[in-house]
């Protein structure tokens, strides 16, 4: 009898271990080309795929610049994941979007200066971001997808307004409610009364999506990312497996090296892939609002499903260690081995 109990215990333990190891399904929405932390975040996603932690269903650019998706496609190809689908914003629904700082266009510079391998042959055929989101979600189990947003809410406000189509009979909001588990988002500033980039670059979209998103939203804000820095030594040392690797070149084109860069977007990827245990704690539940100056505010309310991450010094150190460890690791199946 004791032997049977032991066998059953081992069997159940094995089943639970397999269930616990089930990859997190992630869709990544990024403003690739504005700040280089997006590149670090994307590198982390590939490494998580390598180790079986996540299943990256697709990547959406919240911009309409071709340089953004060309950069993403080159990264997909170099890291050995050429078939990850990519979406782009075809037209902007908001007239308030302005991005004229030429220094920020490292994605354009990087792909223009180097002959990277590409998988996509027809850039005009790349699907509109919200349409790709509908397509991807329609194929997933209910409540199974984590949306990681590290750019503007442009794709998502268009998703909210979308109607039934060839992919789903549901409207956009209903499809999000049915298929998403949660949204992990880098946006806002809950510690200072200052506007934050991902909010004010498409103010209209941020106001609407933060209010209307039908699932829980977990915010990693400006202050958290600013307090965790990606060391420049890693940029120099970690990417020698590929000639002219896009990540160190992005840092070079973005600003004069050497410099450490805040881990704004990588924290969202980390929390989505691994959870926040050991890395952060969560605030009380509440509402996130955006005023006319794009300043975010958090109001505690136990009936809401918005929260933000908080970190102490030990957790900051743990975040940096983990991001460095992941990005220093070479990919499993790189396109171009040096």
Where are these regions (language model features)?
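N-terminal acidic, glycine/proline-rich low-complexity segments
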Residues: 21-338
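Bacterial Sec-dependent N-terminal signal peptides
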Residues: 1-23
């Amino acid at each position: 009898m004791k032997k049977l109990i032991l066998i059953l215990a081992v069997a159940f333990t094995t089943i639970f271990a397999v269930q616990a190891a089930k990859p997190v399904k992630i869709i990544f929405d990024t403003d690739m080309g504005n700040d280089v932390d997006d590149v670090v975040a994307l590198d982390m996603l590939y490494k998580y795929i390598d180790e079986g932690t996540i299943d990256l269903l697709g990547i959406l650019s919240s911009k309409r610049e071709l340089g953004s998706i060309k950069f993403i496609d080159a990264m997909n190809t170099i890291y050995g994941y050429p078939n990850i689908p990519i979406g782009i914003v075809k037209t902007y629904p908001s007239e308030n979007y302005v991005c004229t700082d030429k220094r920020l266009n490292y994605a354009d510079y990087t792909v223009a200066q180097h002959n990277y391998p590409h998988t996509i042959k027809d850039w005009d055929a790349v699907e509109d971001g919200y349409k790709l989101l509908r397509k991807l979600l329609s194929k997933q189990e209910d409540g199974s997808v984590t949306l990681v947003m590290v750019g503007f809410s442009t794709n998502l406000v268009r998703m909210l307004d979308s109607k039934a189509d060839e992919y789903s009979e549901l409207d956009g909001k209903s499809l999000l409610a049915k298929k998403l588990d949660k949204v992990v988002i880098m946006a806002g500033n809950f510690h200072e009364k200052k506007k934050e980039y991902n909010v004010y670059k498409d103010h209209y979209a941020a106001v609407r999506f933060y209010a209307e998103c039908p699932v829980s939203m977990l915010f990693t804000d400006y202050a958290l990312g600013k307090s965790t820095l990606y060391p420049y030594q890693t940029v120099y040392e970690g990417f020698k497996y590929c000639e002219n690797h896009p990540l160190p070149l992005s840092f070079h084109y973005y600003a004069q090296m050497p410099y450490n860069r805040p881990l704004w977007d990588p924290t969202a990827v980390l929390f989505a892939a691994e959870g926040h245990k050991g890395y952060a704690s969560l605030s009380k539940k509440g509402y996130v609002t955006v005023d006319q100056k794009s300043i975010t505010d958090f109001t505690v309310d136990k009936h809401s499903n918005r929260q933000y991450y908080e970190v102490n010094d030990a957790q900051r150190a743990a975040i940096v260690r983990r991001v460095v460890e992941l990005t220093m690791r070479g990919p499993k199946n790189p396109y171009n081995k040096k």
